[in-house]
Amino acid sequence: MAAMTVQLDIVSAEGGIYSGRVSHLQVTGSEGELGIMHGHAPLISKIKPGMARVTKQDGSEEVFYLSGGILEVQPASTSILADVVLRADDIDEKAAIEAKNRAEAHMVDAGSDFDYQAALIEIAKATAQLRVLETIKKNIAR
């Protein structure tokens, strides 16, 4: 019996990042974690900054960082339209730590015209990148 898979396309403003058959997709939607497999009900959801874990048709996994976007699930395909997509190997850990620290420092020293929402978004994005890297490191250690 053939594995039950779904076509997944991950696209950013810069172009296509991933296209292929997958047996499972895990992503963080606006209402929490979503697991998408063959036969999932149609769905449209906002995506929070975080990780997309893709289990390919051959059983191997690939992990991506998504800065946010939209997930669309249809009977024959699933699409992620993301603001920014990075393969886990392309995440700069040092830059993510610096961005998080910089945003946190700005919040402490903020004046009345400071944009707290923008700082919180930057912290969330940097933290999500660091979580993706942490997940990859844990998987390698196994």
UniProtKB/Swiss-Prot annotation:
The record's section on Pfam families has: ATP-synt_DE, ATP-synt_DE_N
Record keywords: ATP synthesis, Cell inner membrane, Cell membrane, CF(1), Hydrogen ion transport, Ion transport, Membrane, Transport
Task: Report the superkingdom from the record.
Answer: Bacteria
Which GO CC annotations does the UniProt entry carry?
plasma membrane; proton-transporting ATP synthase complex
List the membrane topology term(s).
Peripheral membrane protein
The principal location of this protein is membrane
Name where it's found.
Cell inner membrane
- What SUPFAM superfamilies does the annotation carry? Epsilon subunit of F1F0-ATP synthase C-terminal domain (SSF46604), Epsilon subunit of F1F0-ATP synthase N-terminal domain (SSF51344)
Q: CDD domains of this UniProt entry?
A: F1-ATPase_delta
Q: Say if the entry is tagged with keyword Cell membrane.
A: yes
Which GO molecular function terms does the record list? Answer: ATP binding; proton-transporting ATP synthase activity, rotational mechanism
NCBIfam families xrefs: ATP_synt_epsi (TIGR01216), PRK00571.1-4 (NF001847)
The subunit structure is: F-type ATPases have 2 components, CF(1) - the catalytic core - and CF(0) - the membrane proton channel. CF(1) has five subunits: alpha(3), beta(3), gamma(1), delta(1), epsilon(1). CF(0) has three main subunits: a, b and c.
Entry function: Produces ATP from ADP in the presence of a proton gradient across the membrane.
Q: Which family does it belong to?
A: Belongs to the ATPase epsilon chain family.
Tell me the protein's name: ATP synthase epsilon chain
> What gene is this protein a product of?
atpC
